[in-house]
Amino acid sequence: MSTTIEIPESSKVAKGKAVAVVAPARPGGWKKGVAIMDFILRLGAIAAALGAAATMGTSDQTLPFFTQFFQFEASYDSFTTFQFFVITMSLVGGYLVLSLPFSIVAIVRPHAVGPRLFLIILDTAFLTLATAGGASAAAIVYLAHNGDQDTNWLAICNQFGDFCAQTSAAVVSSFVAVVVLVLLIIMSALAIGKP
C-alpha cells in the first residue's frame, strides 16, 4: 500500500526570486593553458635545436679549384667550436624531447609543483648550455664573415659562401631555441609563483 500526498498548486503563494549561486571559478585554472603553451613551445624548441645541430653538422663546401697538393675545403669539423656547437645543440634537443612527458604531466595536473620545478631547474641548465654553444659559434661565424685585421685572419665567406650561409642559419636557429627556453622558464616560474 502506497500513500501519496497531493499538493495542489495555489496561485495565492507569492513567487519570489532566489539568489543564483554560481560555483566559484577554480583558482589557477589558467595554469592548464600555460602547461599547454609550455608543451607547444617545447616542440618548437626541439625543432630549433635539432635543426641547428643538423644544419651545422651538414655544413661542408669544397672549392671547385685545387692544386696538385691542396684541396680547399671548409667543414664544421674543421673548427672545434662548431663541433662543440653540434654536440651542445644535440644535447639540448635530446633533453627537450625527454622533457615532453613532464610537460604532459603538467597539463594533466596543472597544480602540481614538482614537475614544473624539475623543468625549471633543467631548463635553466640547458639554457646555459645552448647559450654557450650558440655564442661560441656566433663568434667564429663573425670572424668567417669579417675576419680580423689585428690578428691577420682573413674573411673566408667570400670564397665559401654556402658554408657561411649554413653556419649562420644554424647560429640563428640556436638563438631561437635560447629565446624559447627563456620563455619556458618564465612561464613555469609564473605558474609556480601564482596560486
Swiss-Prot record:
Membrane-topology descriptor: Multi-pass membrane protein
Cell compartments where the protein resides: Cell membrane
Keywords tagged on the record: Cell membrane, Cell wall biogenesis/degradation, Membrane, Transmembrane, Transmembrane helix
Transmembrane segments: 34-54, 84-104, 117-137, 172-192
Topology Cytoplasmic: residue spans: 1-33, 105-116, 193-195
Cross-referenced InterPro entries: CASP/CASPL, CASP_dom, CASPL
Extracellular side stretches: 55-83, 138-171
GO BP terms: cell wall modification; cell-cell junction assembly
Keyword Cell wall biogenesis/degradation in annotation: yes
Any one cellular-component term (Gene Ontology): Casparian strip
Signal peptide: none
Subunit-structure text: Homodimer and heterodimers.
Protein name in UniProt: Casparian strip membrane protein 1
Species assigned in the record: Glycine max (Soybean)
Lineage, uppermost ranks: Eukaryota, Viridiplantae, Streptophyta, Embryophyta, Tracheophyta
